[in-house]
Amino acid sequence: MHEHLKEKLAILPDQPGCYLMKDKQGTVIYVGKAKVLKNRVRSYFTGSHDGKTLRLVGEIVDFEYIVTSSNLEALILELNLIKKYDPKYNIQLKDDKTYPFIKITAEKQPRLLITRNVKKDKGKYFGPYPNAQSAHETKKLLDRMYPLRKCSNMPDKVCLYYHMGQCLAPCVKEVTDEQNKEIVDEIIKFLNGGHKEIRSELETKMYEASEKLEFERAKELRDQIAHIDAIMEKQKMIMSDLVDRDVFGYAVDKGWMCVQVFFVRKGKLIERDVSMFPIYDEPEEGFLTFIGQFYENSSHFKPKEIVVPGSIDSELVERFLEVEATQPKRGKKKDLVELANKNAKIALEEKFHLIERDEERTVKAIDNLGKQLGIETPYRIEAFDNSNIQGTNPVSAMIAFIDGKPAKKEYRKYKIKTVQGPDDYESMREVVRRRYTRALKENLPLPDLIIIDGGKGHLAATSDVLENELGLYIPMAGLVKDDKHKTSHLIIGDPPEPVMLERNSQEFYLLQRIQDEVHRFAITFHRQLHGKSVIQSALDDIPGIGDKRKKVLLKHFGSLKKMKEASIAEFVEAGMPKNVAEMIYTYLTDKKTL
């Protein structure tokens, strides 16, 4: 341990706060919180730890700490520091897991929508639903039963929905606020669990219609009842009080934490969320960090009640999230927490079982690959591939596999700068030169094996740069493809000789993964650049569209095809003034051949 670390550890306060661990570059690599800073920070440098924590501690060269006045303040500060520094050893929950909601818009003539984006607007949101199909089935039923407007833009004449009795046609008729409120109240009643009462009302109306010999109407009502029964059959009751609640459980093993969340809506268990991540804190601290990030995600709507395991400070959760938090001692809620804990434990056991099998395969693969090539085991492999179409936007990509697995933080993209026209060999020279000049300058780890997606010419270009320009002697191999553009074999040596691998061997599968991954990474980067240049050139002739607006449009739509399909309203939504939106729409509509 560094001497200055011992000195800093000796004067740590016994107060709550946050600590920031730093590596030799001064980069914050981990942020944590503690009820007692002195005890928590010292624990990293004493006693035994699992492999993941040992790796973290091995990188710590310095630390800072911030004293707070309470545990709640420490929790809030920790989340803000994680967002600010994005440390590599902290969990950062992504916003890519979203659930559908049904929304009643706050427009003068309201609509029913399905959305995955819960906004702080005046709309009313119901959900989450376990999947899009479930949300669409419920919306379809409500559309049949309640005649809110369906069209996003008001048409000039009545549409088919009016003739089907599913819309009051506010486009041509006056629909009062009272009428809309009555319909919206019925929908809210249904979505809040009042479907039994509504079903009973429909049943009464069906019998009345039948007695009046209105058989078509009776059949419509019978079908609506059948749809209600079908949807409700899929959502079994587990709680009788109809309160919306999220039930949390967790398990910890071998330095990993799994948190399971059960979404209970209107008494029904509709979905669960599973998150797994490495943990370097006490389990309770890790859980609090997780739950803070969980509800920052816009797709996770705070329910009326949050149910947490007995080991968690529910009072702190309640104050932090401003939602009722409970720790059940008995009954149905306690059973649900135990079920969530059990599922989390099973998920971790499955993960470790798969990891053990995967470790065996990958270790065997890289070990065998080294033997086949006559080199030391290549624990770190770096692979290169070029991509261009007819010489436009030439790019290259480098990926890294460490211990037989992709290390995505090590991936690099390169725009070709010095080569004119489509020259694969010179492009490879440039990229290899840039990559390893920087590696030497910044003392970055060098690979045990370099793989080039190409043949003898590519290998010769790479070897020339490494050995004759940079003085590096790193084993390298070329990946040769067959006539179907699939991995065929390796070539290695000077002159290069083929190395044939068994096609069903783990080392061959590893090479396939490397080749597919570097090709995917390169071609994706090329398409991004090509798409940008196509959109930018397509918009060059439109008055009022400069580089800034081009970037906004590119970010919003992603492709020229989507822009050509967009309406004026969608261009306005993307941030364009109405007159500019009209010009873009007119220009792209006229230019059919773009």
Swiss-Prot record:
Entries under Gene3D superfamilies matching the protein:
5' to 3' exonuclease, C-terminal subdomain, GIY-YIG endonuclease, UVR domain, UvrC, RNAse H endonuclease domain
**SUPFAM superfamilies, sorted:** C-terminal UvrC-binding domain of UvrB, GIY-YIG endonuclease, RuvA domain 2-like
List each copy of the UVR domain by range.
196-231
Give the record's GO biological process terms. Answer: nucleotide-excision repair; SOS response
Enumerate the spans annotated as GIY-YIG domain: 14-91
Where does the UniProt entry say this protein principally localizes?
cytoplasm
Per the record, its GO cellular-component terms are: cytoplasm; excinuclease repair complex
One annotated GO molecular function is: DNA binding
**Subcellular location(s) per record:** Cytoplasm
Entry's PROSITE patterns?
Answer: GIY_YIG, UVR, UVRC
Which one Pfam family would you cite for this protein?
UVR
UniProt keyword DNA damage present: yes
Q: Locate the coiled-coil region(s) and give their ranges.
A: none
The record's keywords, sorted A to Z, are: Cytoplasm, DNA damage, DNA excision, DNA repair, Excision nuclease, SOS response
Which family is this sequence assigned to?
A: Belongs to the UvrC family.
The job of this chain, per UniProt, is described as:
The UvrABC repair system catalyzes the recognition and processing of DNA lesions. UvrC both incises the 5' and 3' sides of the lesion. The N-terminal half is responsible for the 3' incision and the C-terminal half is responsible for the 5' incision.
**Subunit structure and binding partners:** Interacts with UvrB in an incision complex.
Q: Name the NCBIfam families for this protein.
A: PRK00558.1-5, uvrC
Q: What is this protein called?
A: UvrABC system protein C
Task: State the species of origin.
Answer: Bacillus mycoides (strain KBAB4) (Bacillus weihenstephanensis)
Q: Taxonomic classification, please?
A: Bacteria, Bacillati, Bacillota, Bacilli, Bacillales
